[in-house]
């Protein structure tokens, strides 16, 4: 898998955010506990204690560079606690302030001014300046995935206006530009040398105490500009498998098993000393149907496949009930997501008729390419193949090695599975995977009306008018795109009974532990 693909996944939910999803025979989900670690209203948050967190990763893929490719969730967690980004996912909005306290666009939505938070300092006491931010963003832009991390913003278009004001000038009008600052916009001190990056002081709520082989201890930053941090320390332990991580939590060796998955959640359901935290809309697992050419280019064929799938059965069996059905639109975590577009249901008779009208060759067997890059992906392909056979479509599931899949299949094959974090915006997915000029147009889709709606959305500042345009964009995607989004997987954490106020946002939002505390 290439660097760009990994970084885009982290933009939403991180690598392996589906955890240990697997087909189970049990029903539609365990005890919902999205407020699990919040504590009761009568409890007062306490200071102190060390939170021990398990996170997925491989020792061979460890990175210490905040602007590198974080293939390990453990690395991203550590980096996110030490180094703040300019913005973060919000509870009610796509973007909330962090190291940047505010931002304001020009009238044409091309020039944006970001203000560095008052009182923000590096861990060595040095004030954070606009020059530090500019240097860091230019370093980020120079990475192999830089164009995807800061699309439309060239290095020369990143400048400091004064000590606390950073100016970003986009090549085009972009009402969603602040979204870009939620990703890996970690800020380092200007001119930090590459051989000092691993131990460079950050600006986050925790300071690095030690790091060994992917494991780390972080201690509270008492001078954090973002407010009082409750925990004394966070210890992060790296685990190569969700099951090993779950076992460590059940044995009391760690307090939190992050992104542990549905199988472990089922195991923990009977434990009164363990809480299951569900983060809705954490991972989308669509089937991609190539629209540019091949057997699925006819929109009637794509519609037939969408009508042939049993979405509720997919969620129940593939996700063990820890998820929700999809409606073939990416960006389900966006407040602008069009929930009023009619939900597709299963209609085998209509599917067969559409296939006949399109002259689809039902005598042929078609390959559906997948990989076990995340657990549950291959299982979803197998169940999908079984379901669409009832409409007369014969599918042969081909499991590929992840490297082969991402190098030879992704963006090219007529029919394959993929996965994305879904707490990103509708416009994010449009820009990355669906507009005609996208370099990662997974289905090879070209639809002038969609492109026009996308450009209009980027250039519209008025909230009411923008909402109308975004709705139109989603209607087109729902009707014509190459995606069959049958469901979204919940992110699942396991937490010991004393843990309080774990974040419930999907994707990057779940690594914000500055308000977490321990009732012990």
Predicted ranges, named:
Residues 54-107, 201-202:
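N-terminal lobe/hinge region of extracytoplasmic solute-binding protein
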Residues 2-3, 8-21, 26, 309-335, ...:
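Detector for C-terminal structural segments
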Residues 222-267, 394:
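Ligand-site clamp/hinge motif
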Residues 101-146, 161, 295:
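Aromatic- and charge-enriched surface segment that lines or borders ligand/interaction sites
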Residues 173, 181-229, 233, 243:
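Gly/Pro-rich hinge or "lid" segments in bacterial periplasmic/extracellular proteins
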Residues 111, 115, 148-190:
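Surface-exposed binding/hinge segments that line
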Residues 52, 129-136, 163-169, 204-205, ...:
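Alpha-helical secondary-structure segments
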Residues 257-347, 372, 376, 439-448, ...:
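Local pocket/hinge segments that shape ligand/substrate recognition
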């Amino acid at each position: 898998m290439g660097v760009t693909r990994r970084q885009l996944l982290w933009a939403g939910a991180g690598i392996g955010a589906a955890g240990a999803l697997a087909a189970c025979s049990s029903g539609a989900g365990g005890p919902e506990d999205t407020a699990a670690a919040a504590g009761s209203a009568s409890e007062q948050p306490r200071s102190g204690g060390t939170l021990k967190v398990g996170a997925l990763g491989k020792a061979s893929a460890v990175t210490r560079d905040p602007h590198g490719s974080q293939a390990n969730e453990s690395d991203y967690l550590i980096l996110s606690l030490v180094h703040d980004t300019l913005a973060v996912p919000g509870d009610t909005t796509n973007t909330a302030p962090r190291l940047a306290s505010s931002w304001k666009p020009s009238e044409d939505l091309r020039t944006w001014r970001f203000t560095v938070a008052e009182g923000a300092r590096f861990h060595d006491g040095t004030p954070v300046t606009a020059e530090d931010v500019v240097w860091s963003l230019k370093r980020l832009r120079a990475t192999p995935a830089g164009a995807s991390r800061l699309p439309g913003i060239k290095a020369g278009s990143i400048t400091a206006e004064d000590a606390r004001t950073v100016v970003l000038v986009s090549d085009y009008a972009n009402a969603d530009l602040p979204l870009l600052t939620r990703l890996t916009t970690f800020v380092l001190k200007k001119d930090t040398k590459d051989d000092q990056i691993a131990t460079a002081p950050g600006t986050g709520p925790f300071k690095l105490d030690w790091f060994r082989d992917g494991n780390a201890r972080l201690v509270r930053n008492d001078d954090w500009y973002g407010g009082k941090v409750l925990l004394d320390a966070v210890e992060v332990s790296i685990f190569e498998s969700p099951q090993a991580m779950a076992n460590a939590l059940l044995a009391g060796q760690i307090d939190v098993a992050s992104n542990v998955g549905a199988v472990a959640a089922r195991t923990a359901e009977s434990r009164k000393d363990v809480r299951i935290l569900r983060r809705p809309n954490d991972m989308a697992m669509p089937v991609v149907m190539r629209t540019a050419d091949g057997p699925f280019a006819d929109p009637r064929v794509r519609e037939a496949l969408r009508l042939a799938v049993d979405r509720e059965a997919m969620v129940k069996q593939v996700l063990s009930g820890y998820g929700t059905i999809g409606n073939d639109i990416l960006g389900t975590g966006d407040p602008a997501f069009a929930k009023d577009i009619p939900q597709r249901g299963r209609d085998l008779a209509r599917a067969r008729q559409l296939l006949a009208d399109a002259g689809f060759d039902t005598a042929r067997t078609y390959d559906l390419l997948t990989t076990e890059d995340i657990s549950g992906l291959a299982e979803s392909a197998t169940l999908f193949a079984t379901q669409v056979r009832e409409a007369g479509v014969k599918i042969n599931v081909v499991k590929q090695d992840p490297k082969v899949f991402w190098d030879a299949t992704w963006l090219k094959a007529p029919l394959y599975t993929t996965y994305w974090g879904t707490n990103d915006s509708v416009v994010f997915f449009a820009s990355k995977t669906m507009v005609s000029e996208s370099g990662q147009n997974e289905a090879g889709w070209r639809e002038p009306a969609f492109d026009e709606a996308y450009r209009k959305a980027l250039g519209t500042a008025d909230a009411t008018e923008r909402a109308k345009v975004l709705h139109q964009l989603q209607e087109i995607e729902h009707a014509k795109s190459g995606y069959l989004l049958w469901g979204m997987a919940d992110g699942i954490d396991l937490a010991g009974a004393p843990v309080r106020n774990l974040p419930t946002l999907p994707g990057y939002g779940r690594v914000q532990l500055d308000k977490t505390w321990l009732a012990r």
